[in-house]
Amino acid sequence: MGGVHPDSTETQSLLGQAQTGDRQAFDELFGRHRDALRRAVELRLDARLRARVDPSDVVQETQLEAFQRLPDYLERRPMPFRLWLRKTAYERLLKVRRHHLKTARRAAGREVALPHESSLLLAEQLLAGGPTPSQHAAKHEVARQLRTALGELSEGQREVLLMRNFEGLSYQEVGYVLDIDPAAARKRYGRALLQLRQRLLAGGFRESEL
C-alpha cells in the first residue's frame, strides 16, 4: 500500500475510445469497477440510509456523472481512472447522505454509525493475534463500542479508516480521493486509530487485547 498504481495499457486504450464519444467503451471500463464501487458504498450505508437508498442506485448515478464529467477528467488527468471513479462515488454518496439525513442529523446530532458488518471487520483488524474463542466473543463487544466511537469521529477520519483498512489504499491514493496531502492522510489515520484505541481501553479492554 505504498504508492499509486497507474492505469493499465488496456484502461488507457478504452479511455482513448471513450474520449471520442464511444459510450460503449466507457461502460465497459466502468463495468470493471462496478463491484468495487458497490462494495465501497455498502460499507458506508448505516441503518438509516439502508432503508432509503439502494447501493446500486448510487453506483448508477456515479456512472452517469462520471460519463458527463469525463471530458474534464481526460483533459486534466489529475489521478488514475479508478481513483477518479472512487472519488466521484464518494462525492455522490455525500450528496445522498445530505439529502436523506438532513432531518435526522438535526434531530440526532452529527453522529453517523457505520454498518454493523463494517464495525465487525474493523474489530477483527484491531484485535491482536488470531481468532481465539475469547477474541471471537470479544469481537462483538469491540464492534459495539466501535460503532459508538466511530460515530464520534469526523467524516474525514472515518473515510481514512475505511480506505486504508477495507479498500487497501495507500496514503497517496487516499490523498487523491479526499483532496489532502499524503502526510495529512497519514496523520489523520493515526489520530483516528488513537482515538478508537483510547475509547476501547476506557471501555475495559486491555492494551494486550488491541
Regions found by a protein language model. Name each.
Residues 2, 115, 120-121, 176-177, ...:
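C-terminal edge and immediately downstream basic/flexible tail or linker adjoining helix-turn-helix-like DNA-binding
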Residues 57-64, 79-91:
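Structural recognition of an alpha-helix C-terminal capping motif at a helix-to-coil junction
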Residues 18, 37, 41, 58-66, ...:
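Short, small-hydrophobic-rich alpha-helical interface motif
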Residues 72, 87-112, 116, 124, ...:
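Arg/Lys-rich amphipathic alpha helix in sigma70-family domain 2
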Residues 2, 116-148:
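Acidic, proline/glycine-rich intrinsically disordered inter-domain spacer in sigma factors
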Residues 30-53, 68-72, 150, 195, ...:
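Amphipathic, Lys/Arg- and hydrophobic-enriched alpha-helical face
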Residues 8-14, 30-31, 50-71, 167:
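Conserved RNAP core-binding helix
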Residues 9, 15, 148-159, 163, ...:
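Helix-turn-helix DNA-binding module
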